[in-house]
A protein has these predicted regions:
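Histidine-rich, glycine-flanked metal-binding segment
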Residues: 1-50
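C-terminal cap of metal-dependent C-N hydrolases
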Residues: 310-338
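Hydrophobic faces of well-ordered beta-strands that scaffold small-molecule active sites
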Residues: 52-60, 81-83, 103-107, 144-148, ...
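Metal-associated gating/positioning segment near the N- to mid-region
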Residues: 36, 43-98
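His/Asp/Glu-enriched, well-ordered alpha-helical/loop segment
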Residues: 241-318
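Divalent-metal coordination cores built from histidine and acidic residues
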Residues: 71-151
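Divalent metal-coordination and catalytic microenvironments
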Residues: 10, 25, 46, 57, ...
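Active-site core of metal-dependent hydrolases
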Residues: 148-263
Length: 338
């Protein structure tokens, strides 16, 4: 068989040296050695070949936090940018649809979305369950979950009520909730106790709200997915290390990339992934946390090199050494790769 594209001699994490062939926009074959019968053959010996990266928590919509993904996507290998709550029911129509990258969305339970820095769920009139359900069902292919930010500034005296409403919407539509945890009140345990298997807690190792106690362990054991969500203040090495030691390894790694984190401390998804390597997580596990795991969490057809899957690929040059990386609180560790 003749292929459209053959990536020859690359290293697939957890598998080893492989050739990857593409035909008709799909992955046609993956094997230790394939015939050099392709319209284009690219020698990627010594390079890392992965599915296109899937960033589960970004902000690419209009508003206070939003950035343009296009200038960053090409050199970071991130082909799927999940917009995590920039838009609510009032503003979803203004959220960009991907051209060069895919932009699935998590609908903010607050209909105003993230038009400002915070406070979107202080007025419960904006957390309209029926309107949110209607919005999801009208755009179900794009809207893959519900986003709720729970911290003192965002919800004010409303506590976990916005989360309860988000969970009602999610249950009605058969989708997960991603909840941002931050400064109490409400307490992080009160938030975790409400989450269902398949729901996502982002900023899981923030150092601000640190899920480390019995409620966190119980949530992790029942299938609540822990997501890094680095951002400008959402990641602390010491908290992540304690979680890993307790058996609460994060399921997904994401950047929470936005206008206040893109120039540091998060920078981009490969840089954030290197920080997981710096605490001792294996490369293959870190790659999975940035590809197949976020895709599974939202039911996306992405994140895999399986034959027949879309030919959504990334190729990385990898340098071995000792590279200092910093979290959001200026703690540093040493990563073995970049």
């Amino acid at each position: 068989m003749s292929y459209d594209l053959l990536l020859a001699g690359g290293d697939v994490p957890g598998v080893g040296r492989r050739d990857v062939a593409v035909h008709g926009g799909l992955i046609a074959a993956v094997a230790p050695e394939l015939p050099r019968q392709a319209r284009t053959v690219v020698d990627v010996t010594g390079r890392l070949v992965t599915p296109g990266l899937v960033d589960l928590h970004t902000h690419v919509g209009p508003g206070y936090w939003g950035i343009d993904p296009a200038p960053i996507a090409w050199y970071t290998g991130v082909t799927t940018w999940v917009d995590a709550g920039s838009a609510g029911a009032y503003t979803m129509a203004g959220l960009a649809r991907g051209t060069e990258v895919r932009i699935p969305a998590l609908l903010n339970i607050s209909a105003v979305g993230l038009t400002g820095r915070t406070g979107e769920s202080r007025d419960l009139a904006n957390c309209d369950v029926d309107l949110a359900i209607e919005t999801v069902l009208a755009d179900r292919e794009r809207i893959r979950g519900i986003k709720v930010r729970i911290d003192a500034e965002t919800v004010g005296p409303n506590g976990v009520e916005p989360l309860r409403r988000g969970l009602t919407v999610a249950a009605a539509c058969g989708i997960p909730v991603m909840v941002h945890v931050g400064t109490a009140p409400p307490a992080v345990d009160e938030v975790l106790d409400l989450l269902r298997p398949g729901d996502i807690v982002t900023h899981c190792a923030s150092g601000i709200a640190s899920p480390l106690g019995p409620a966190a362990l119980a949530a992790h054991r029942r299938g609540v997915l822990f997501d890094i969500g680095h951002g400008s203040g959402g990641f602390a090495f010491d908290v992540l290390e304690a979680q890993v030691d307790a058996g609460m390894t994060p399921y997904t790694v994401s950047t929470d990339l936005h206008a206040r984190s893109v120039y540091g401390p998060a920078f981009d998804l490969p840089t954030t992934m290197a920080k997981l390597l710096a605490v001792g997580l294996p490369l293959a596990d870190v790659i999975a946390a940035g590809t197949v795991h976020p895709a599974r969490a939202l039911g996306l057809n992405a994140g895999t090199l399986d034959v027949g899957a879309p030919a959504d690929l990334a190729v990385f040059a990898v340098e071995e050494g000792r590279f200092e990386v910093a979290d959001a609180h200026r703690q540093t560790r040493t990563a073995p790769l970049r």
